[in-house]
Curated annotation (Swiss-Prot):
The protein's name in its UniProt record: Protein lin-7 homolog A
Assembly: Forms a complex with CASK and CASKIN1. Component of the brain-specific heterotrimeric complex (LIN-10-LIN-2-LIN-7 complex) composed of at least APBA1, CASK, and LIN7, which associates with the motor protein KIF17 to transport vesicles along microtubules. Can also interact with other modular proteins containing protein-protein interaction domains like PALS1, PALS2, MPP7, DLG1, DLG2 and DLG3 through its L27 domain. Interacts with DLG4, GRIN2B and MARCHF11 as well as CDH1 and CTNNB1, the channels KCNJ12/Kir2.2, KCNJ4/Kir2.3 and probably KCNJ2/Kir2.1 and SLC6A12/BGT-1 via its PDZ domain.
Residues covered by the L27 domain: 25-80
Family statement: Belongs to the lin-7 family.
Length: 233
């Protein structure tokens, strides 16, 4: 659990302090499940309703919401009262999940930053009309040993900075600039990556054909020039 951090927000008269309280979401959910179990034992509430609510609280989706919310709360830059920060965090969390509609839910992955790098490659970007994706997990690298990332994960943010709609170089710079560790928000969309790679392969094939045609034309021109020189001599 992160320790509370204190940031100052100067005003015209005096500096006011905003204390960012640490979240206790894991403990809160565990306590809620404990209370549900006690209610179930008492028989005051229909068992099937309590079991349904308990199942929701223990689901992967609820865990993902909790992780993303806590990540947003820790990284979002907001000055103001705790209520204002909570509203801003909630909006950022909803936006992350709304962007994932039709795909896997967002996940938070934290990797240590070492001299050997992070152990994955990215492709795509605004200049290619494509999201930024994890295109390769390097065998034996940090990402593979950690096990949190997958080939086909779309990169949503790096250390709290969104890379959706950004150029490829922006994501690379953020990854390189990270110190000690890097927190990523990703979502798994392998089909989109496959479509993107297929599109890139078509472009590469078309480029190779153009180069071959250009080479043939150059050879033909050289042959014509050589033929003309032979006739002149």
């Amino acid at each position: 659990m992160l320790k509370p951090s204190v940031t100052s927000a100067p005003t015209a008269d005096m500096a006011t302090l905003t204390v960012v309280q640490p979240l206790t979401l894991d403990r809160d959910v565990a306590r809620a499940i404990e209370l549900l179990e006690k209610l179930q034992e008492s028989g005051e509430v229909p068992v099937h309703k309590l079991q349904s609510l308990k199942k929701v609280l223990q689901s992967e989706f609820c865990t993902a919401i909790r992780e993303v919310y806590q990540y947003m709360h820790e990284t979002i830059t907001v000055n103001g009262c705790p209520e204002f920060r909570a509203r801003a965090t909630a909006k950022a969390t909803v936006a992350a999940f709304a962007a994932s509609e039709g795909h896997s839910h967002p996940r938070v992955v934290e990797l240590p930053k070492t001299d050997e790098g992070l152990g994955f490659n990215v492709m795509g970007g605004k200049e290619q009309n494509s999201p930024i994706y994890i295109s390769r997990i390097i065998p034996g690298g940090v990402a593979e040993r950690h096990g949190g990332l997958k080939r086909g994960d779309q990169l949503l943010s790096v250390n709290g900075v969104s890379v959706e709609g950004e150029h490829h170089e922006k994501a690379v710079e953020l990854l390189k600039a990270a110190k000690d560790s890097v927190k990523l928000v990703v979502r798994y969309t392998p089909k989109v990556l496959e479509e993107m790679e297929a599109r890139f392969e078509k472009l590469r094939t078309a480029r190779r054909r153009q180069q071959q045609q250009l080479l043939i034309q150059q050879q033909q021109q050289q042959q014509q020039q050589q033929t003309q020189q032979n006739h002149m001599s």
